[in-house]
């Protein structure tokens, strides 16, 4: 018995999503289009750690302790895992309104604001929302055709509205929002510890070697160590400073976007409605709270009307389950297969019987 299975091309939702994101692995990986600085981040981390494991760790494990490369490997793996999780995950993109939803929202806005006289500027599209006895304004996004949720903002680089938008980070090649902020914070924290660790033990390595062969001779024999020290020295200040800044924001339950705009620290001195007034509670909510699922449904299947593909024919959707012997299967050509699977044509109507012939002349 032979079975013919015809597979149809499936259109996933990530193939039709608007915005400026790129997708890999059938929609499982989501990043921004500008990935050059992200590759630079990978190169610096991988290159520095490779040199450290190849030269300094081997010497320090013998001279001091074998635990030195073990802790370095743990920090390196944790940093890479959090970096990739931050870069490849959905930061919290909010889907755009469908045409029917956008039309309904426009009708609501027109009914609320009324007719605007010609030549006058229409009023701002804002809704008031109450959080912890405080009024928060929900702004309308003209690109996504939605009223953005609280703390959401539209990223001009990725062209998407992101929930609890913090900032767009080119070093990780993605936006930082509600769904990947904790991984971003853990990445910069672990990277700070890794940078300090590698920098400190490079200094120890140079000091131990200098006691035996001298300082200048050590620098000549280990040019890779000099390169590592320079990279770590210039990286240390920015990474550690960034970690301290975000630790301050986490303690206040505040985002970078809110801090830049002065939403809760400006002249009005409006109290942050999202802060619990306790550092421990704020840290637990930001870093340990439940992770919301992605609302994009990137790997969902689009119906044929939306995917733009033609409907399958009868021959494409049907399968042949006719029992055949091996010999007949080998000698059957494509025309015979088509005849077997095609729909039989209607039989023509029977012809009327011919009238009886006239009697011969002899009978007459």
From Swiss-Prot:
Q: Name one GO cellular component term.
A: endoplasmic reticulum membrane
Please, which domain of life does this record's source organism belong to?
Eukaryota
What is the uppermost EC class here?
A: transferase
Composition bias, Polar residues: 310-336
Q: Which residues lie on this side of the membrane: Cytoplasmic?
A: 1-35, 85-183, 250-364
Q: Does the keyword Acyltransferase apply?
A: yes
Protein name in the entry: Palmitoyltransferase ZDHHC9
Write the lineage as a comma-separated list: Eukaryota, Metazoa, Chordata, Craniata, Vertebrata
**Gene name, please?**
Zdhhc9
């Amino acid at each position: 018995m032979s079975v013919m299975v015809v597979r149809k091309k499936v259109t996933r939702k990530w193939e039709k999503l608007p915005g400026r994101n790129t997708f890999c692995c059938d929609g499982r990986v989501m990043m921004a289009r500008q990935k050059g600085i992200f590759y630079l981040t990978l190169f610096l981390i991988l290159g520095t750690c490779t040199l450290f494991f190849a030269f300094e760790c081997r010497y320090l494990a013998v001279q001091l302790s074998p635990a030195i490369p073990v802790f370095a490997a743990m920090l390196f793996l944790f940093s890479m895992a959090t970096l990739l999780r931050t870069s490849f995950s959905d930061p919290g993109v909010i889907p755009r309104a469908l045409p029917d939803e956008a039309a309904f929202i426009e009708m609501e806005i027109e009914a609320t604001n009324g007719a605007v006289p010609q030549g006058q500027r229409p009023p701002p599209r804002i809704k008031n929302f109450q959080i912890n006895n405080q009024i928060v304004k929900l702004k309308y996004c003209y690109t996504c055709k939605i009223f953005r949720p609280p703390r959401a903002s539209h990223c001009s680089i990725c062209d998407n509205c992101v929930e609890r938008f913090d900032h767009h980070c080119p070093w990780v090649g993605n936006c930082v929002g509600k769904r990947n902020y904790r991984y971003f914070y853990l990445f910069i924290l672990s990277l700070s510890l890794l940078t300090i660790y590698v920098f400190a033990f490079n200094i120890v390595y140079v000091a131990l070697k200098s006691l035996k062969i001298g300082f200048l001779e050590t620098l000549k024999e280990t040019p890779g160590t000099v390169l590592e020290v320079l990279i770590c020295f210039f990286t240390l200040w920015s990474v550690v400073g960034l970690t301290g800044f975000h630790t301050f924001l986490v303690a206040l339950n505040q985002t970078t976007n809110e801090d830049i705009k002065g939403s809760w620290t400006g002249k009005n001195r409006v109290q942050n409605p999202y802060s619990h007034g306790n550092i421990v509670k704020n840290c637990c909510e930001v870093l340990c709270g439940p992770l919301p699922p992605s609302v994009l449904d990137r790997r969902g299947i689009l119906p044929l009307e939306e995917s733009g593909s033609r409907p399958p024919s009868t021959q494409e959707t049907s399968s042949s389950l006719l029992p055949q012997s091996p010999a007949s299967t080998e000698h059957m050509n494509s025309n015979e297969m088509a005849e077997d699977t095609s729909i039989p044509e209607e039989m023509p109507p029977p012809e009327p019987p011919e009238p009886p012939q006239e009697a011969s002349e002899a009978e007459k």
